[in-house]
């Protein structure tokens, strides 16, 4: 979906930025819908869902609307991007996909992974129950991995049936996928005061692993070629875990050795998005129809056991800092979202090639 959207005039993608820009306007000025319903981001830090999840085996079409319309979302200054999920075409199919990749420069290099995240990317979120004991489930030291292979698996398929004497078509379509990829970066972190004084100047290495799963299901039922009902389900699980080791100057370190020290930051963001949609279309007459539907979305964002350790340079090597310089932090976010829409549509002409109509309805 992202590749298709960026080919539209006025839409661009910047390296290192998660979402697209429309006429120079970023995430907060755009909106994303899924089958016409507003859909939240899988990442609580963003307003719009990442288009990276939507490959050609998942979407039927994607549209970009840069002009205001009465049925659209109001808080949009750039564009509304509507993703239409895939439905079964034909009587049935089955597809299986497998891909892999590696970086020959780093494939056998030591890669640091934090403790507490399993192979599927689900993190251990258990907090210490006893504040006097602080029995953490996760180890403080990261582990080392010596073989990094990017990999992706997918499967999709569906089947069509005919129900009753009218042979009304009932179709099912399901797709699921898993992706794991690794990133290794050299980083430089510098901070200054408003007067230009440098109080932080550190360099280091960051090891990042991205694990995600996506599942999408669609059920369609047509009744007498006049009424249509469909249910869509989508689940996105995304885990980003990283370990960063940095050395250099930081004002929190002891000034006896020019504020030199070492920082290790271990962080995992474990996010889950679940989308449920029910859509109906009722042909009341040849020229009048009723569209009605509802969606229920669930977002869960976890940042379990973020670990930050700082040690300062000293005469005997490195020592722990005093005060609140060490950190183990837990955060959770749970949000439910309900959207409904209904509208009466009157076709001005009873002609297949004539699409002019009048619509009166509600979306919210």
Where are these regions (language model features)?
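Flexible, surface-exposed loop regions and adjacent strand-edge segments
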Residues: 112-117, 186-197, 245-258, 307-316
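Transmembrane beta-barrel wall of Gram-negative outer-membrane proteins
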Residues: 138-245, 274-276
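Short loop/turn motifs that connect adjacent beta-strands in outer-membrane beta-barrel proteins
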Residues: 88-93, 162-171, 225-226, 285-289, ...
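Extracellular loop and loop/strand-boundary signature of outer-membrane beta-barrel proteins
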Residues: 140-143, 198-205, 259-266, 275, ...
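Periplasmic N-terminal accessory/gating domains of Gram-negative outer-membrane beta-barrel systems
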Residues: 1-21, 25-27, 36-70, 77
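Residue-level signature of outer-membrane beta-barrel architecture
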Residues: 66, 85, 159-161, 220-223, ...
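Transmembrane beta-strands of outer-membrane beta-barrel proteins
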Residues: 94-98, 170-176, 229-231, 290-294, ...
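Transmembrane beta-strands of outer-membrane beta-barrel pores
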Residues: 100-104, 176-182, 235-239, 296-302, ...
């Amino acid at each position: 979906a992202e590749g298709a959207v960026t080919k539209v005039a006025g839409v661009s993608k910047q390296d290192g930025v998660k979402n697209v820009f429309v006429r120079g306007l970023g995430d907060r000025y755009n909106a994303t819908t899924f089958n016409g319903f507003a859909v939240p981001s899988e990442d609580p830090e963003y307003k719009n869902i990442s288009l990276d999840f939507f490959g050609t085996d998942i979407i039927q079409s994607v549209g970009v609307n840069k002009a205001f319309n009465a049925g659209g979302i109001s808080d949009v200054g750039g564009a509304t991007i509507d993703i239409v999920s895939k439905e079964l075409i034909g009587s049935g199919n089955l597809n299986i996909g497998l891909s892999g990749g590696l970086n020959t420069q780093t494939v056998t290099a030591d890669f640091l992974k934090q403790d507490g995240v399993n192979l599927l990317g689900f993190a251990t979120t258990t907090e210490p129950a006893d504040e006097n004991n602080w029995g953490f489930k996760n180890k403080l030291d990261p582990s080392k991995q010596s073989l990094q292979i990017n990999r992706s698996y997918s499967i999709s398929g569906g089947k069509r049936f005919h129900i009753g004497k009218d042979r009304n078509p009932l179709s099912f379509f399901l797709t699921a996928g898993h992706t794991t990829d690794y990133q290794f970066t050299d980083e430089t972190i510098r901070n200054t005061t408003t007067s230009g004084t440098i109080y932080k100047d550190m360099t280091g290495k960051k090891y990042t692993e991205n694990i995600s799963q996506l599942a999408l299901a669609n059920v369609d039922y047509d009744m007498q070629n006049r009424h249509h009902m469909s249910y869509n389900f989508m689940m996105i699980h995304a885990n980003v875990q990283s370990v960063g080791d940095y050395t250099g100057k930081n004002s929190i370190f002891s000034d006896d050795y020019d504020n030199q020290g070492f920082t290790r930051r271990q962080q995992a963001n474990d996010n889950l998005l679940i989308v449920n949609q029910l859509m109906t279309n009722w042909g009341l007459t040849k020229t009048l129809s009723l569209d009605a539907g509802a969606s229920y979305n669930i977002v869960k964002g976890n940042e379990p056991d973020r670990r930050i350790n700082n040690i300062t340079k000293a005469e005997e090597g490195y020592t722990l800092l005093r005060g609140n310089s060490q950190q183990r932090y837990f955060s959770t976010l749970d949000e439910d979202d309900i959207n409904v829409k209904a509208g009466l549509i009157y076709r001005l002409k009873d002609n297949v090639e004539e699409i002019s109509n009048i619509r009166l309805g509600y979306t919210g």
